[in-house]
C-alpha cells in the first residue's frame, strides 16, 4: 500500500483529518482539492464480507449449524463478518493513520454499497475521534469542498438495506445452489436476480423454438409523379399494396407465433396473398395509371430524451457503441473518479439547477438561441428508493467541458462514453424536433379487381435537439431512428401516377428477437427486477456461470440454463416468478426508507410467517422449509431432460444434460420390441432454436463411431475421424482380437467394480489430433495417416546420440531432443524437416521465457480500435486469449476461436483494460505503532478483526 496523500498535520494548528474513499484514483483527486490539512487514503472497496468458503470461517464458529451460511439465522440473522485476507494490510495501515488525526471523514459513495463500506470502516477501525460522513455526487473542487463543509451522519437505514440484500442473497444462493449441484451439475449457482434473468432469456429461446413462420406476399410499386406534376420532388417513389377489393392485405402483425392469423383479427376482412395471387395482380397492373385518392399531411413534434440514468446509459452504450453493460460501467466509473461525469449509479433523470443552466448555455453557444427550449426542462420519474436518488448522469461541474476540450485527456472508450453523456445532457435542454408526415392513398384497377396502395413519408423541418443527439434503435428488434426521413412528392387528390415497375414481394414472419444486453436491461427495468446498479454484474454472472453465451450481440441460453430454469420453475416457482421478485425489490427498498424492519423481514422469508401475499415464500413456510421439502421430490433425470418434439414416428426427442455435456436421445424399438436409447452428441456451436427435427435426424444419422476415411495399407486397420471431448482427432480401429482391453476412443476399460483398468494391458490404437488447418468433414485418409505418424522420428543427434522427433503439441508444432524442445514455425515442418535442418535449429542458442520463439497465433483478426494494433488469438497456459501485443484477455465461455468477431475481441480487450493491471500479492505491510484502543461497544454483527 502506498503512503498517504496529504500532510500529517494541518496548518496553523488546524485539525488533522483522515479522509477514506474507496479507490486510489478517487483519493488522488480528492487530495488535490482538499489540501494539506487532509490525509486522503483508500480502502480499495469493501474491507469486510461474509466468509467466501468454509476455510474462511473462524475456528470457534466452524461447529455452529449456521457456519456454512456465514449468517446466524437463530440470532436475528447476525452476519459473520471477516476481514478479507487481501485487505488485512489495508486495515492495519488505516488504523495506523488514524492514530495521528483529530477527525475521520468517510467519503465513500452515497449509495447502499458506499454507505455499507463506511459503516464497516467504522466497525473495524473503531475510531476514538469524531467521525463525519462526507457525501458528493461529482468530483469537482466545488462539490468536494462543499461536502467537507457540510457532512452528515451515517445513514443506518441505508446500511440495513445493503446488509439485508447481502444476507438475503447469501441465504438464497447457499440454500438453492446445492440443489442444482445434486440434481443438475456441480459448480452451478442460483441467485435472487440471476436466476430470474436466466429464466427471461430461456423463455425467449423457448418462444423462438416454438415459433412457426408464416409466409405472406404483397406488391411494391414504383410510381412516377411527373405525369401530373413535372416539378414534383422526388419524381419517383414507392408504394405498397394494402387492400384488394376492400379486403386489407395481411402483414406480419396479423400472424401469431404458430404461423396462423391472430385470434383478434377480423379474418373476414383480411386477405393473405400468396406468390401466384401477387404475381397475377402485378401482371394486371403493368402499364396502368393509378390515382391519388387522398393525401393527408400532419405536423409532428418530438421531445428530447431525459438525461441518462444507469439503465439507459447501459442500453444506449450497448446499442450505439456495442459496449457490454460491464464495460460501460467500468468506463463510467473511471470518468466519475477522475471528475468528468457525475455519479454513474442512479435511478434519477433529474438535473440540478446549475446543470440545467450549463446545458442551456452550451446549447445556445453551439447551436443558436432557436435550438434552446423556451423554458428549462425538468425530467422527473418515481424513484423506488429516495435515499439513493442522485442526480442524473451528466458532465461534472457548473460548466460542461465539450468533448473537443477533453479528447486529449481521455482514452478512446472514455471519450465515447463522455461524448454520449455530454450530448444526451445538452440535448435534454434543447427545443423539440419538428416535421411533417405525409400519407398517400393510391387506387387503381387490376382487371376487375380494385386495389389500394399506400405510401407514407416523413420530413424533418426543424431538427431541434436532434442536432446534438439521436437515440439508436435496437437492430435485433427493428425500428427506425428519429432523424430518418422518407420524402414523398407533395400530391393532391385526383392526380395521376404512372406505374414504372411492380415487384411481388414475399415475406416470412420472424421469431421474437433474442435479448441483447441492452434489451435485457430494459426488460429487467420494466419488470422491476433488480436495480440498475446491479444489472452489469447480473449479466456478467449469467455468462460466467455458463448459463448464457453471446452470439454477436445476442444472448443465447445453454441447455444447462434450460435444465436449471425448468427445475426452479417446477419446484421453486415463486423464486423465479417475475412479480414476486419485483415485489421483493420493493420490500427491500422499504427497509432502505426505514419503513420495514429487516430482522422481521428476513425471519419471515427464511423461516416463514404471515408476510406477503397468500402464496408468498413466507406464507408457504419459508425458504428453508421450501428447499427441505422439495429436494427429495426432484427427479434428476426429468429436470435434465428437455423435450424438443416428436419425430415422424411419434417418438419423443429429448436433449439430455449430462455430466460431460448435452446430447440428443430418443428410444428405438428393437426386433424384440425392447426399447433402446439412440444418442447423438450436440455440437457446441448449435443454438437451441437451430435444433430442428431435420437437424436432429442428421445428428442421429451421423455414425457414433466417426467418419470412416479408409484403410491403412500397411496395417489393414480402418481409420476414422471423430469429434471427441477435447476436439477432433483421427484414430485406427483395432480388430476385435486386438481390442480386448479398451475401446479405441477411450484407451481404458471399466472393470466389474467400476474402476478403470490401464490401457497398457493391451494394444492401444494410434491417435492424432487434427491440426488447426484441418477440418473434421474434409480431412482425407492421406492427411490422417500423416497425423498417425506423429511423433515423427527426424533422426539421431550424432553428438549426443539422442533421438530428435517432430511433434504436435498444445502450443503448436515443435522438435524434441531429450528434455530440450524447440518450436517450429509451421505445421508442415513436422512432416518434412530433415535432420540437418533440425540440428541447425538446436545449434542456435535457446531463448527462454518471453524471448523464445512464440508458436503461431491460432487466428489473426483486425485492428483494435483503442490501441490501433492488430489483434491475434493465441493459445496460452490457461487457454486461448486475444492480444494486441500490450493487453491480453482470455476468451470466455461461449467465445469460439473460429467464430469470434473483431468486435467481440476488441470488447474483451477493453474489458481487461478497464479492470486495470493484474494484482500481484501485496508485500507485507510495515508494522505501524498504534495506541491501545479503548474498549468500545460491540459492533452489530459477529465481527472478526485482525489480531
From Swiss-Prot:
Catalytic activity annotation: ATP-independent breakage of single-stranded DNA, followed by passage and rejoining
Site (Interaction with DNA): 46, 165-166, 169, 174, 181, 345, 545
NCBIfam families reported in the protein's UniProt record: topA_bact
Organism, scientific name: Mycobacterium leprae (strain TN)
Gene: topA
Domain annotation Topo IA-type catalytic: ranges: 155-614
Molecular-function GO term, any one: DNA binding
Cystine pairs: none
CDD domains named among the record's database cross-references: TOP1Ac, TOPRIM_TopoIA_TopoI
Enzyme class label: isomerase
Region (Interaction with DNA): 189-194
PROSITE patterns the record matches: TOPO_IA_1, TOPO_IA_2, TOPRIM
Protein's recorded name: DNA topoisomerase 1
Amino acid at each position: 500500500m502506498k503512503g498517504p496523500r496529504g500532510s500529517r498535520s494541518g496548518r496553523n494548528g488546524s485539525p488533522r483529518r483522515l479522509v477514506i474513499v474507496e479507490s486510489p484514483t478517487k483519493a488522488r483527486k480528492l487530495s488535490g482539492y482538499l489540501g494539506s490539512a487532509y490525509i486522503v487514503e483508500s480502502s480499495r472497496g469493501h474491507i469486510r464480507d461474509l466468509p467466501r468458503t468454509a476455510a474462511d470461517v473462524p475456528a470457534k464458529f466452524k461447529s455452529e449449524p449456521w457456519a456454512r451460511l456465514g449468517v446466524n439465522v437463530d440470532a436475528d440473522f447476525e452476519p459473520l463478518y471477516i476481514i478479507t485476507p487481501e485487505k488485512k494490510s489495508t486495515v492495519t495501515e488505516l488504523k495506523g493513520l488514524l492514530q495521528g488525526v483529530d477527525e475521520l471523514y468517510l467519503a465513500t459513495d452515497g449509495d447502499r454499497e458506499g454507505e455499507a463500506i463506511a459503516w464497516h470502516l467504522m466497525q473495524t477501525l473503531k475510531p476514538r475521534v469524531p467521525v463525519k460522513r462526507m457525501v458528493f455526487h461529482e468530483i469537482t473542487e466545488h462539490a468536494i469542498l462543499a461536502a467537507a463543509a457540510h457532512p452528515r451522519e451515517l445513514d443506518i437505514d441505508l446500511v440495513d438495506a445493503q446488509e439485508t440484500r447481502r444476507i438475503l442473497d447469501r441465504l438464497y444462493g447457499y440454500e438453492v445452489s446445492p440443489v442444482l449441484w445434486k440434481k443438475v451439475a456441480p459448480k452451478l449457482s442460483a441467485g435472487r436476480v440471476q436466476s430470474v434473468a436466466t429464466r427471461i432469456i430461456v423463455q425467449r429461446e423457448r418462444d423462438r423454438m416454438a415459433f412457426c413462420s408464416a409466409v405472406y406476399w404483397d406488391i411494391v410499386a414504383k410510381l412516377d409523379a411527373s405525369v401530373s406534376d413535372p416539378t414534383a420532388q422526388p419524381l419517383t417513389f414507392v408504394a405498397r399494396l394494402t387492400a384488394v377489393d376492400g379486403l386489407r392485405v395481411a402483414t406480419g402483425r396479423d400472424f401469431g407465433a404458430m404461423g396462423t392469423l391472430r385470434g383478434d383479427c377480423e379474418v373476414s376482412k383480411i386477405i393473405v396473398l400468396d406468390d401466384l395471387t401477387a404475381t397475377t395482380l402485378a401482371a394486371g397492373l403493368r402499364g396502368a395509371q393509378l390515382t391519388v385518392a387522398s393525401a393527408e399531411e400532419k405536423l409532428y413534434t418530438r421531445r428530447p430524451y431525459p438525461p441518462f440514468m444507469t439503465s439507459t446509459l447501459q442500453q444506449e452504450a450497448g446499442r450505439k457503441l456495442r459496449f457490454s453493460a460491464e464495460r460501460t460501467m467500468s468506463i463510467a466509473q473511471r470518468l466519475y473518479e477522475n471528475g468528468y461525469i457525475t455519479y454513474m449509479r442512479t435511478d434519477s433523470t433529474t438535473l440540478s439547477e446549475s446543470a440545467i443552466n450549463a446545458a442551456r448555455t452550451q446549447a445556445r453557444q453551439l447551436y443558436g438561441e432557436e435550438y434552446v427550449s423556451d423554458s428549462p426542462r425538468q425530467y422527473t420519474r418515481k424513484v423506488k428508493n429516495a435515499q439513493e436518488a442522485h442526480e442524473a448522469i451528466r458532465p461534472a461541474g457548473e460548466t460542461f467541458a465539450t468533448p473537443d476540450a477533453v479528447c486529449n485527456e481521455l482514452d478512446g472508450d472514455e471519450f465515447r462514453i463522455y461524448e454520449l453523456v455530454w450530448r444526451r445532457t445538452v440535448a435534454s435542454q434543447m427545443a423539440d424536433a419538428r416535421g411533417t408526415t405525409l400519407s398517400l392513398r393510391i387506387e387503381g384497377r387490376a382487371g376487375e379487381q380494385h386495389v389500394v396502395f399506400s405510401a407514407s413519408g416523413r420530413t424533418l423541418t426543424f431538427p431541434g435537439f436532434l442536432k446534438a443527439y439521436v437515440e439508436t434503435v435496437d437492430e435485433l428488434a427493428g425500428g427506425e431512428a428519429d432523424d430518418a426521413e422518407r420524402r414523398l412528392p407533395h400530391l393532391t387528390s385526383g392526380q395521376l401516377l404512372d406505374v414504372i415497375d411492380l415487384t411481388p414481394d414475399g415475406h416470412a414472419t420472424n421469431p421474437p428477437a433474442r435479448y441483447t444486453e441492452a434489451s435485457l436491461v430494459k426488460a429487467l427495468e420494466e419488470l422491476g427486477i433488480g436495480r440498475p446498479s446491479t444489472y452489469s454484474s447480473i449479466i456478467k454472472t449469467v455468462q460466467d456461470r455458463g448459463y448464457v453465451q453471446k452470439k454477436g450481440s445476442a444472448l443465447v441460453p445453454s441447455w444447462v440454463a434450460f435444465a436449471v430454469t425448468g427445475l426452479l420453475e417446477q419446484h421453486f416457482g415463486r423464486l423465479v416468478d417475475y412479480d414476486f421478485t419485483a415485489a421483493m425489490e420493493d420490500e427491500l427498498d422499504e427497509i432502505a426508507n426505514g419503513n420495514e424492519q429487516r430482522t422481521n423481514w428476513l425471519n419471515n422469508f427464511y423461516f416463514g410467517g404471515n408476510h406477503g401475499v397468500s402464496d408468498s415464500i413466507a406464507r408457504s413456510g419459508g425458504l428453508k422449509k421450501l428447499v427441505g421439502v422439495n429436494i427429495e421430490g426432484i427427479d434428476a433425470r426429468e429436470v435434465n431432460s428437455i423435450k424438443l418434439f416428436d419425430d415422424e414416428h411419434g417418438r419423443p426427442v429429448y436433449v439430455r444434460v449430462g455430466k460431460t455435456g448435452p446430447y440428443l436421445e430418443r428410444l428405438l424399438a428393437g426386433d424384440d420390441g425392447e426399447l433402446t436409447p439412440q444418442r447423438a452428441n450436440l455440437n457446441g456451436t448449435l443454438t437451441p432454436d437451430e435444433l430442428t427435427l431435420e437437424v436432429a435426424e442428421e445428428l442421429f444419422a451421423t455414425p457414433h463411431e466417426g467418419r470412416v476415411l479408409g484403410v491403412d495399407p500397411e496395417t489393414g486397420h480402418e481409420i476414422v475421424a471423430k469429434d471427441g471431448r477435447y476436439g477432433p482427432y483421427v484414430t485406427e480401429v483395432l480388430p476385435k482380437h486386438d481390442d480386448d482391453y479398451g475401446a479405441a476412443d477411450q484407451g481404458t476399460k471399466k472393470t466389474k467394480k467400476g474402476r478403470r483398468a490401464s490401457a497398457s494391458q493391451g494394444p492401444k490404437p494410434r491417435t492424432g489430433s487434427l491440426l488447426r488447418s484441418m477440418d473434421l468433414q474434409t480431412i482425407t485418409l492421406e492427411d490422417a495417416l500423416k497425423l498417425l505418424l506423429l511423433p515423427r522420428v527426424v533422426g539421431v543427434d550424432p553428438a549426443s546420440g539422442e533421438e530428435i522427433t517432430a511433434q504436435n503439441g498444445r502450443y503448436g508444432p515443435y522438435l524434441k531432443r531429450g528434455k530440450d524442445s524447440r518450436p517450429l514455425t509451421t505445421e508442415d515442418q513436422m512432416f518434412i524437416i530433415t535432420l540437418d535442418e533440425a540440428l541447425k535449429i538446436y545449434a542456435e542458442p535457446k531463448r527462454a521465457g518471453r524471448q523464445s520463439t512464440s508458436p503461431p497465433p491460432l487466428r489473426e483478426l483486425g485492428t483494435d480500435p483503442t490501441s490501433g494494433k492488430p489483434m491475434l488469438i493465441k493459445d496460452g497456459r490457461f487457454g486461448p486469449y486475444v492480444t494486441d501485443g500490450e493487453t491480453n484477455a482470455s476468451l470466455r465461455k461461449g467465445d469460439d476461436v473460429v467464430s469470434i468477431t473483431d468486435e467481440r475481441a476488441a470488447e474483451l480487450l477493453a474489458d481487461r483494460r478497464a479492470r486495470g493491471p493484474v494484482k500481484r500479492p501485496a508485500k507485507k505491510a510495515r508494522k505501524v505503532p498504534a495506541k491501545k484502543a479503548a474498549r468500545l461497544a460491540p459492533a452489530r454483527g459477529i465481527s472478526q478483526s485482525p489480531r
